Amino acid sequence: MRTPWAAMHQPAFVLHSRPYKESSALVDLFTPQGRLRAVMRAARGKAGSLIRPFVSLEVELRGKSELKTVARLESAGPAHWLDGQALFSGMYLNELLIRLLPAEDAHPALFEHYVATLPALAEHRPLEPLLRAFEWRLLDELGYGFALDIDIAGQPIDAQRLYRLVPDAGLEPVVGFQPGLFNGAELLAMAEADWQVPGALAAAKRLMRQALAPHLGGRPLVSRELFMNLKESPRD
């Protein structure tokens, strides 16, 4: 929900930053008020060292246009040190937020989910359930969510049937095999987040890719490509 802007102190995380004019930086922030873009002046100073992802910040922004000015920025807690696959997973979440969240569209519940996900990544908990939960929450917050236990006709999902995803509508039963289908047992497992069911986690990854694809505009995710390149690179 887009909310009227008022200058205030609020928690924030840096999603992305880049140099902007002389010694300034252009920063994309994620806050309870949504994704905000701001100019950080004197970005090479002490405060500028905080302009990096996964650091819990307290920020004061000023300005009425979509491009704000950082009036104050300080650490609000320890940084979440992500490495390896957890680092690429964090980059993936940040890229999803940049690509999909409209500017200044408040999603406080999504922000809290992000806050809870970062330490879980830093603790090297299983990545796939964390990523699927965040993707699902993001889709739901943006109004693109759909039921996993009921099809688009309002009928309960049948564990013995096959279904296809109709983007932004829901799951539709199909007769006969075709690429990209999901079996009902997998869908019911997803609805309960029961990842012990064989194939459920892999099916959830396919489902989220299909659900997100129409909203990414056909452009590949850089974080996903970097991760795939890392996996494919030869090792000594």
Swiss-Prot record:
Q: What is the lineage of its organism?
A: Bacteria, Pseudomonadati, Pseudomonadota, Gammaproteobacteria, Pseudomonadales
Alphabetized InterPro entries for the sequence: ARFGAP/RecO, DNA_rep/recomb_RecO_N, NA-bd_OB-fold, RecO, RecO_C
Family according to the record: Belongs to the RecO family.
Q: What does this protein do?
A: Involved in DNA repair and RecF pathway recombination.
Which key words tag this protein in UniProt?
DNA damage, DNA recombination, DNA repair
Name-wise, this protein is DNA repair protein RecO
Q: Which GO terms describe its biological process?
A: DNA recombination; double-strand break repair
What would be one Gene Ontology cellular-component term for the protein? bacterial nucleoid
